[in-house]
Amino acid sequence: MKSKLIILLTLVPFSSFSTGNNFEINKTRVIYSDSTPSVQISNNKAYPLIIQSNVWDESNNKNHDFIATPPIFKMESESRNIIKIIKTTINLPDSQESMRWLCIESMPPIEKSTKINRKEGRTDSINISIRGCIKLIYRPASVPSPVFNNIVEKLKWHKNGKYLVLKNNTPYYISFSEVFFDSDKVNNAKDILYVKPYSEKKIDISNRIIKKIKWAMIDDAGAKTKLYESIL
């Protein structure tokens, strides 16, 4: 019998999410500050799932500055489990945030897929592995919790030729919930999903005349802030 594996990757900016009603993570970001953080996983299926968790960097490479434990385990149906995040290095910046991705992957046990295929008369076994990834943000002790009314004063938007430039003068990773150019919502905003600390992003606005920017950010709990405005 042939076996195929399909992996679906999900990155979502909500307060919690369900990956195709397969498993649910109770948050969309982990803030690592002075205590060991954790996430709760719920198996919503009527059969067990194999759960594997890893930490990746922003370049989609496995990262060893943090580990997720347990790294792999079996979840019974209609059950919950906790994954803890442990920092394994002291070589992270102490004056600004660092970000990784916590990725959690689920797959039905092989025997479950085999029974389904036999029942349906198929000779191939297809296991669908679903991976959900959430932001893992390390916030050193010297960096206080963000106050967004203060942060907004240090986010600078300006035009430079065909580019709209966003400069982040804060020690925080700033994630955006929504962005408006004048009154038009930016639906394909992959270039401005988030901006790193003390960095800038350029957004190509060729053939557009923009006079005003409105935006909402995402707070530590995954909720949307109020809309802020900047005149260009």
Curated annotation (Swiss-Prot):
Task: Name its cellular compartments.
Answer: Periplasm
Can you list the GO cellular component terms from the UniProt entry?
A: outer membrane-bounded periplasmic space
Function description: Involved in the biogenesis of the CS6 fimbria.
Which protein family is it in?
Belongs to the periplasmic pilus chaperone family.
Organism phylogeny: Bacteria, Pseudomonadati, Pseudomonadota, Gammaproteobacteria, Enterobacterales
Gene3D superfamilies this protein is in?
Answer: Immunoglobulins
Q: Which cysteines are joined by disulfide bonds?
A: none
Kindly indicate whether the keyword Chaperone belongs to this entry.
yes
What this protein is called in its record is Chaperone protein CssC
Annotated InterPro entries? Ig-like_fold (IPR013783), PapD-like_sf (IPR008962), Periplasmic_pilus_chap (IPR050643), Pili_assmbl_chap_C_dom_sf (IPR036316), Pili_assmbl_chaperone_bac (IPR001829), Pili_assmbl_chaperone_C (IPR016148), Pili_assmbl_chaperone_CS (IPR018046), Pili_assmbl_chaperone_N (IPR016147)
Q: Which terms under GO biological process does the entry name?
A: cell wall organization; chaperone-mediated protein folding
Q: Record's PANTHER family?
A: CHAPERONE PROTEIN CAF1M, PILUS ASSEMBLY CHAPERONE
**What Pfam families does UniProt report for this protein, alphabetically?**
PapD_C, PapD_N
Give the record's keywords alphabetically. Chaperone, Fimbrium biogenesis, Immunoglobulin domain, Periplasm, Signal
The positions making up the signal sequence are 1-20
